[in-house]
């Protein structure tokens, strides 16, 4: 399990403190934040003086050029109150033109490699959203030996035949090369559309504990994948509780029944 610290994006210090206790209670030792996540890095930074050794710390840059990515990353270190992080990720490399810039000469990747050479970063990863991201991650791995990828994985997404095919191809390559496969959007119910936003997630999430159990157990039932938690503090206890009870992987019939019962729909089409 990975704590998706986007959940702290709008949190005050007094709201963030109980989250740390929750992470320690459930033994969650991987924090994933980003320069773009509002107050998140600063909130995580308040924990680092006394708890840096307890966590694998990951952040992201959304910049595409060397100088901007370098500057943004160094500001992240300041906000996080650390000398180094474990993982720096190039965030949301989906659009081909941005991909070419970030991974080309003078691109953000050069800043990440420099940071690793300077001992500021141990690993370099790439993240993204949407139906083409699995294919784009394969392309990224052809260009550079990234240590990790991050992308959506849930039942509605995997009912998209092309996405499922690309995801499986990516999973094969990751397994062969020892690339960490991090997944997001695990408890997505459907897009908000015109419905009232009742959570901080940018999709409508599953909220019933039994439904969250099925969704979380389905993701964690796949070997060699990590599950990143949703960007809403109120959902964390339910997700952590589900993960702590993970056992047998739900059957296809159980998951299809969940899809139909809750009218689940893919976030990306």
Task: Give residue spans per PLM region.
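N-terminal binding-site loop/beta-alpha segment at the start of enzyme catalytic domains
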Residues: 1-55, 111
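Beta/alpha (TIM)-barrel catalytic core signal, keyed to glycine-rich beta->alpha loops juxtaposed to Asp/Glu
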Residues: 93-269
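A short, structured active-site edge motif that brings together acidic residues
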Residues: 54-65, 87-91, 151-153
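Short, acidic/polar
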Residues: 11-24, 66-81, 131-141, 210-216
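Acidic (Asp/Glu)-rich catalytic clusters
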Residues: 24-25, 45-54, 74-83, 114-116, ...
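Conserved, mostly hydrophobic/aromatic
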Residues: 3, 31, 44, 57, ...
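Active-site groove signature of glycoside hydrolases
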Residues: 77-100
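Short catalytic-loop micro-motif centered on adjacent basic/acidic residues
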Residues: 29-35, 58-60, 122-127, 226-228
């Amino acid at each position: 399990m990975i704590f998706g610290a986007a959940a702290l994006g709008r949190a005050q210090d007094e709201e963030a403190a109980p989250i740390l206790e929750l992470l320690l209670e459930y033994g969650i030792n991987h924090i994933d934040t980003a320069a773009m996540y509002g107050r998140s890095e600063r909130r995580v930074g308040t924990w680092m003086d006394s708890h840096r050794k307890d966590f694998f710390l990951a952040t992201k840059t959304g910049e595409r050029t060397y100088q901007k990515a370098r500057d943004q990353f160094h500001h992240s270190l300041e906000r996080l109150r650390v000398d180094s992080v474990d993982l720096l990720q190039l965030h949301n490399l989906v659009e081909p033109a941005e991909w070419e810039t970030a991974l080309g000469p003078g691109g953000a990747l050069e800043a990440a490699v420099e940071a690793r050479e300077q001992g500021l970063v141990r690993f370099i990863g790439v993240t993204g959203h949407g139906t083409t991201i699995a294919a784009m991650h394969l392309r990224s791995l052809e260009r550079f030996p990234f240590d990790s990828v991050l992308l959506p994985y849930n039942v509605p997404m995997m009912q998209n035949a092309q996405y499922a095919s690309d995801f499986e191809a990516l999973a094969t390559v990751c397994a062969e090369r020892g690339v960490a496969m991090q997944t997001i959007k695990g408890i997505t119910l459907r897009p908000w559309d015109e419905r009232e936003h009742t959570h901080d997630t940018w999709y409508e999430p599953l909220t019933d504990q039994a439904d969250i159990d099925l969704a979380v157990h389905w993701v964690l039932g796949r070997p060699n994948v990590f599950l990143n938690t949703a960007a809403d503090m109120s959902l964390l206890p339910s997700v952590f509780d589900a993960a702590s009870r993970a056992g047998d992987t739900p059957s296809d019939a159980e998951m299809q029944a969940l899809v139909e019962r809750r009218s689940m729909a893919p976030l990306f089409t």
